[in-house]
From Swiss-Prot:
Residues 25-112, 121-215, 233-322, 327-411 form the Ig-like C2-type domain. InterPro entries: Cell_Adh-Cytoskel_Orgn (IPR050958), Ig-like_dom (IPR007110), Ig-like_dom_sf (IPR036179), Ig-like_fold (IPR013783), Ig_I-set (IPR013098), Ig_sub (IPR003599), Ig_sub2 (IPR003598). Belongs to the hemolin family. Glycans are attached at residue 283. SMART domains: IG (SM00409), IGc2 (SM00408). It comes from Manduca sexta (Tobacco hawkmoth). It is found in: Secreted. It comes from the Eukaryota. This is Hemolin. Hemolymph. Pfam families: I-set.
Length: 413
């Protein structure tokens, strides 16, 4: 009797579990953000994976119906993809695509359409520096306004010839996240009559680098300081908030001779790591930067750098790292599944977020309702699923740090 019950239960589980089916209209994945340059044609893609013909597409912008025909926009044939012919600032917004077919109404996740730009300085100047030999030095470089935030690169360049330039890889020299260049000590090898240190900005808004400022070091002042070995804080990170999934860099830069190699600890535990580790001090900064390749929620805590060059007084600096997270799926449904009529059917959808992100469900692009559907932290249960329940089910979560959307097409057999 027990054996028969087990067999019957196994059969029920097999029938209730989602199974692959013949492909029907399912939207291709889209990027969460699309950047555009003003007046440069840009595409917001929306198309089914198989390029299905009998699909009617529509769009929303910032939560409202978007009539693209009233704008300088074209639509690709047999797709919902929009081609912004000459996009401008007013085209920025949060877009969403809908694809209606015999299977129901499929919905894309929200696509952020943003203008990329950078405010380019009108002048370039070269500043001559004459630092004290063996002292620490800061070469300033302000990051221009722009979106996304421009990237700063430093190079050692021969005069005005940008084609003759080298990357700066000296252990004593490290760039801060604000774009400034720091020398733990300036030495004779840094002096040159021909070369200069050039700070440049890079951005998706502009082709190539944009030089911002240059510095020459043609000579050094004689050092009369008898305490040259004392460690001096040049740049250290303050308490930080990091987003899960992002790269996080914590800085601990001290000047002094000889140069110190910071040791790193998290809540008292050594996190120096190896070059291949997710958390490591080995990233071409001689330990002055702790590199977290992918930030996790469990990285929250207090990071401390111990600095000692065996000459000056040892130094210590602590940074409190707080980790937040936009919604991230820990479990989500397949894009297309089949359910057996009459059985209870579960659509899995589990989300991790900090702070917590409420989950909402849609059916064919509308808020879901009905006494036979029950939402839980692990997913959506449809009791006694029927043919009329065929369609697209969307699981969406949102908090102040982002949003996530997953959708599945349920076919009832």
């Amino acid at each position: 009797m027990v054996s028969k019950s087990i067999v019957a239960l196994a059969a029920c589980v097999a029938m209730c579990v989602a199974q692959p089916v013949e492909k029907m209209p399912v939207l291709k994945d889209q990027p969460a953000e699309v950047l555009f340059r003003e007046s440069q044609a840009t595409v917001l893609e929306c198309v089914t994976e198989n390029g299905d013909k009998d699909v009617k597409y529509s769009w929303q912008k910032d939560g409202k119906e978007f009539k693209w025909q009233e704008h300088n926009i074209a639509q690709r044939k047999d797709e919902g993809s929009l081609v912004f012919l000459k996009p401008e600032a007013k085209d920025e917004g949060q877009y969403r695509c809908f694809a209606e077919s015999a299977a129901g109404v499929a919905t894309s996740h929200i696509i952020s359409f943003r203008r990329t730009y950078m405010v380019v300085p009108t002048t370039f100047k070269t500043v001559e520096k004459k630092p004290v030999e063996g002292s620490w030095l800061k070469l300033e470089c302000s990051i221009p306004e722009g979106y996304p935030k421009p990237t700063i690169v430093w190079r050692k360049q021969l005069g005005e010839d940008e084609s003759i330039a080298d990357s700066i890889l000296a252990r004593r020299i490290t760039q801060s996240p604000e774009g400034d260049l720091y020398f733990t000590s300036v030495e004779k090898e840094d002096v040159s009559e021909s070369y200069k240190y050039v700070c440049a900005a890079k951005s998706p808004a502009i082709d190539g680098d944009v030089p911002l400022v240059g510095y020459t070091i043609k000579s050094l002042e004689k050092n009369t300081n008898q305490k040259n070995g004392e460690l001096v804080p040049m740049y250290v990170s303050n308490d930080m908030i990091a987003k899960a999934g992002d790269v996080t860099m914590i800085y601990c830069m001290y000047g002094g001779v000889p140069m110190a190699y910071p040791n790193w600890f998290k809540d008292g535990k050594d996190v120096n790591g190896k070059p291949s580790d997710r958390i490591t001090r080995h990233n071409r900064t001689s330990g002055k930067r702790l590199f977290i390749k992918e930030t996790l929620l469990e990285d929250q805590g207090t990071f401390t750098c111990d600095v000692n060059n065996e000459v000056g007084k040892p130094q210590k600096h602590s940074v409190k790292l707080t980790v937040v997270s936009g919604p991230r799926f820990t479990k989500k449904p397949e894009k297309q599944v089949i359910a057996k009529q009459g059985q209870d059917f579960v659509i899995p959808c589990e989300v991790s977020a900090l702070p917590a992100a409420p989950v909402s469900w849609t059916f064919n692009a509308k808020p879901i309702s009905g006494s036979r559907v029950v939402a839980s932290p692990s997913g959506l249960t449809i009791k006694g699923i029927q043919k009329s329940d065929k369609g697209y089910y969307g699981c969406q979560a949102h908090n102040e740090h982002g949003d996530a959307y997953a959708e599945t097409l349920v076919i009832v057999a």
